[in-house]
Amino acid sequence: MQQFEWVHGAWLALAIILEIAANVLLKFSDGFRRKCYGILSLAAVLAAFSALSQAVKGIDLSVAYALWGGFGIAATLAAGWVLFGQRLNPKGWVGVVLLLVGMIMIKLA
């Protein structure tokens, strides 16, 4: 396992934020009917992958990708709730809990 450096953690945090932004912008694009939001969404995805590529220079790929995807899903869920009034049913909440437990287990491994 590589030694953790804060700069790589910062790159990972930026990648997560950009992924969330990309997902929210994609929703705002209304299926790319609103092209400006669609283009911004694509730019955010490219920037997120660029930041992730910097993060994996100092964080194991398996850990970085799991955290990126997991936190991205959880935060996008929260954004959907706050911005769009979207709600999960009980099965969805079980999935979120399993996701978070899995992320913790990967980080501890």
Swiss-Prot record:
UniProt name for this protein: Spermidine export protein MdtI
Subcellular location as annotated: Cell inner membrane
Gene: mdtI
Domain of life of the organism encoding this protein: Bacteria
A GO biological-process term: glycine betaine transport
UniProt entry keywords in alphabetical sequence: Cell inner membrane, Cell membrane, Membrane, Transmembrane, Transmembrane helix, Transport
Quaternary structure (record): Forms a complex with MdtJ.
Entry similarity comment: Belongs to the drug/metabolite transporter (DMT) superfamily. Small multidrug resistance (SMR) (TC 2.A.7.1) family. MdtI subfamily.
Function: Catalyzes the excretion of spermidine.
Predominant cellular place of this UniProt entry's protein: membrane
Gene3D superfamilies tied to this protein: 1.10.3730.20
